[in-house]
UniProtKB/Swiss-Prot annotation:
The gene is psaA. This is Photosystem I P700 chlorophyll a apoprotein A1. The PsaA/B heterodimer binds the P700 chlorophyll special pair and subsequent electron acceptors. PSI consists of a core antenna complex that captures photons, and an electron transfer chain that converts photonic excitation into a charge separation. The cyanobacterial PSI reaction center is composed of one copy each of PsaA,B,C,D,E,F,I,J,K,L,M and X, and forms trimeric complexes. One of its GO terms (biological process) is photosynthesis. The chain crosses the membrane at residues 72-95, 158-181, 197-221, 293-311, 348-371, 387-413, 435-457, 532-550, 590-611, 665-687, 725-745. InterPro entries: PSI_PsaA, PSI_PsaA/B, PSI_PsaA/B_CS, PSI_PsaA/B_sf.
């Protein structure tokens, strides 16, 4: 830690400009007001595309970093307002249109629904009987489980929260306007990283976790304990009664009678009746022990509140971010992190790239925790919700990571200054880019040929009737011994490291089978040759995605092919006329290609997850204790061939969506077709050139002129970049809708 005399550094002050930008509805009502060229209005149809492309590209509107920073800050509040409106809508649907109260009274027999379709042209068929006499669309968002864990016991509480969401949205909209138009922070406020770290760590993460821990202890725990014991929701005291009447808490948790004395006398063990370290899952609900998660949030709060006091601001004590970075030198890293502080305080693209990469990775980790350690009551036995949550978080994580590649490339083009990065880590990585990319390329080739080759071998052997020569658990075994070792360590180690824990952190590693209402919530996931094969496909597709994105970043400014690439900008179709073979080299094009491989990677991940869980985890526990899995454990033998994936997964499990007509799942059947159509539509944009369309348009314009109905705005074909953007958007949208319909029709029909 660095300590400095107080006189050495100026005091941190919150400085703002008053009324920097007038509020003008007249200006906002003018399309393209942010750009001088666009503000003149449309002359060609390209205008509407440029309007959308540049509306949020603040760099193109001004070169003033302070103004850009203010616009981003204000936009954050707008984003939060949208999130609050969305959340409010979710809670309102739960209050007004759902069977939440009926589900709460009987969560194992009644399914969650929060939408009832009006039968205008016969859509009433979509309202399935979800139990308890309620007819509606079954939802798979998991909100009911979250609300149960939070302590919601009636619709009125959901209404109040929905109104609270709208109030927060209004506050956010006001804050966004206020901090741009009335009191706008100066640039030094945005660049004051130590204060920002302290506030974000101690305030947002620390106090946020503390507030949630408080809610869990005082509201969630008592309500959930009574619900678990079978008390009817209507008979449970309301949250404020538990908060205001200590005797009600003391009945459930005797340590409450001692108040806060044990805290100050360091006799913390007294609180172990509501702050526990049990491990595993609650056998009644199949969710994490709520007393464990309350303990977790309290510990996280303490950790982050301490972390929020680490950085030096006005008191001359603590860490300086710049000094930490510049002291970070290794024997082979030259100037180390010198210069990175300047990059991260002047390039928001660099900052965003790092944050997106971190948050994307974290989101993927969340996807895995949601099934391995299901946090909410009864979530684990709702297989459709489990599959939806996994798929959702995987895709969100994938998009964020591709976004990291995008903003990394934009940083390199717009913000990177070679003169300020001499022999530091970033400079050294860029100078080593050929070695990095060529090695990564070799890894991709190796993984691609070998992983695919194993499947080709298996298909060939099975086709020739030689099962004894296949790679499988019953012939030539390729066991994932390292993964099995990790599983074993995680199962055995807590016996020594956490002797008081009742179970391992996750039953996915090993241990018992947790069943709720005769359905498997979680059990040990055994790994074998089939998993070894598909994991190497995962490794291959992930490495190709990384190769594309990293090449886009490292070669964004220059390459041997186009030494002045940085002058052409982040997105350009080719290096001008008369120079063939220079197309698809811009930073933008690498993002474009990266999106396809991200989608490719994650399709295999979610297919693997879906089939593996149906085969080896999800199912019914029979009276004699044996488990009947949904697909009867067919993953190990069927997924080791490409034919098996097509026949026993894609085709066999698509039966539910293909045969859905005439049932409550019929909308998924239509969506399945519509998704395929949108996907096919994308190929029209991806497989044709701009010239073809421009020729066609000119014929159509000629016909309009003949009929004297020529448009005043000149029609133009989409640019090459625009065509690719439309293509990849429809490709992904079509694929996502198709997968959504396939997964939901399948899992809803087998529950």
């Amino acid at each position: 830690m660095t300590i400095s005399p107080p006189e050495r550094e100026g005091k941190v002050k919150v400085t703002v400009d008053n009324d920097p930008v007038p509020t003008s509805f007249e200006k906002w009502g003018q399309p393209g007001h942010f750009d001088r060229t666009l503000a003149r209005g449309p002359k060609t149809t390209t205008w509407i595309w440029n309007l959308h492309a540049n509306a949020h590209d603040f760099d193109s509107q001004t070169s003033d970093l302070e103004d850009v920073s203010r616009k981003i800050f204000s936009a954050h509040f707008g984003h939060l307002a949208v999130v609050f409106v969305w959340l409010s809508g979710m809670y309102f649907h739960g209050a007004r249109f759902s069977n939440y109260e009926a589900w709460l009274a009987d969560p194992t027999h009644i399914k969650p629904s929060a939408q009832v379709v009006w039968p205008i042209v016969g859509q009433g068929i979509l309202n399935a009987d979800v139990g308890g006499g309620f007819h509606g669309i079954q939802i798979t968002s998991g909100f009911f489980y979250l609300w149960r864990a939070s302590g919601f016991t009636n619709s009125y509480q959901l209404y109040c929260t929905a109104i609270g969401g709208l109030v927060m949205a209004a506050l956010m909209l006001f804050a966004g306007w206020f901090h741009y138009h009335k009191r706008a922070p100066k640039l030094e406020w945005f660049q004051n990283v130590e204060s920002m770290m302290n506030h974000h760590l101690a305030g947002l993460l620390g106090l946020g976790s503390l507030g949630w821990a408080g809610h869990q202890i005082h509201v969630s725990l008592p309500i959930n304990k009574l619900l678990d014991a079978g008390v009817a929701p209507a008979d449970i005291p309301l949250p404020h009664e538990f908060i205001l009447d200590p005797s009600k808490m003391q009945e459930l948790y005797p340590s409450f009678a001692k108040g806060i004395l044990p805290f100050f006398t360091l006799n913390w063990g007294v609180y172990s009746d509501f702050l526990t370290f049990k491990g595993g899952l609650n056998p009644v609900t199949g969710g994490l022990w709520l007393s464990d998660t309350a303990h977790h949030h309290l510990a996280i709060a303490v950790l982050f509140i301490i972390a929020g006091h680490m950085y030096r601001t006005n008191w001359g004590i603590g860490h300086s971010m710049k000094q930490i970075l510049e002291a970070h030198k290794g024997p082979f890293t030259g100037e180390g992190h010198k210069g990175l502080y300047e990059i991260l305080t002047t390039s928001w693209h660099a900052q965003l790239a790092i944050n997106l990469a971190m948050l994307g990775s974290l989101t993927i980790i969340v996807a895995h925790h949601m099934y391995a350690m299901p946090p909410y009551p009864y979530q684990a036995i709702d297989y459709a919700t489990q599959l939806s949550l996994f798929t959702h978080h995987m895709w969100i994580g994938g998009f964020l990571i591709v976004g990291a590649g995008a903003h990394g490339a934009i940083f390199m083009v717009r913000d990177y200054k070679p003169s300020q990065n001499v022999d530091n880590l970033l400079d050294r990585v860029i100078r080593h880019r050929d070695a990095i990319i060529s090695h990564l390329n070799w890894v991709c080739i190796f993984l691609g040929f070998h992983s695919f080759g194993l499947y080709v071998h298996n298909d060939t052997m099975r086709a020739l009737g030689r099962p004894q020569d296949m790679f499988s658990d019953t012939a030539i075994q390729l066991q994932p011994i390292f993964a099995q070792w990790v599983q074993n360590i995680h199962t055995v180690a807590p016996g020594a490291t956490a002797p008081n824990a009742l179970a391992p952190a996750s039953y996915a590693f090993g241990g018992d089978v947790v069943a709720v209402a005769g359905k498997v919530a979680m059990m040990p996931i055994s790994l074998g040759t089939a998993d070894f094969l598909v994991h190497h496909i995962h490794a291959f597709t992930i490495h190709v995605t990384v190769l594309i994105l990293l090449k886009g970043v490292l070669f964004a400014r220059s390459s041997r092919l186009i030494p002045d690439k940085g002058q052409l900008g982040f997105r350009f179709p080719c290096d001008g006329p008369g120079r063939g073979g220079t197309c698809q080299v811009s930073g933008w094009d690498h993002v474009f290609l990266g999106l396809f491989w991200m989608y490719n990677s994650l399709s295999i991940v979610i297919f693997h997850f879906s089939w593996k869980m149906q085969s080896d985890v999800w199912g019914s526990v029979l009276p004699d204790g044996t488990i009947s899995h949904i697909t009867g454990g067919n993953f190990a033998q069927s997924s080791i061939t490409i034919n098996g994936w097509l026949r026993d997964f894609l085709w066999a499990q698509a039966a539910n969506v293909i045969n859905s007509y005439g049932s409550a799942l019929s909308a998924y059947g239509i969506m399945f077709l519509a998704g395929h159509f949108v996907f096919a539509f994308s190929l029209m944009f991806l497989f044709s050139g701009r010239g073809y369309w421009q020729e066609l348009i000119e014929s159509i314009v000629w016909a309009h002129n003949k009929l004297r109905v020529a448009p005043s705005i000149q029609p133009r074909a989409l640019s090459i970049i625009q065509g690719r953007a439309v293509g990849v958007t429809h490709y992904l949208l079509g694929g996502i809708v198709t997968t959504w319909a396939f997964f939901l029709a399948r899992t809803l029909s087998i529950q």
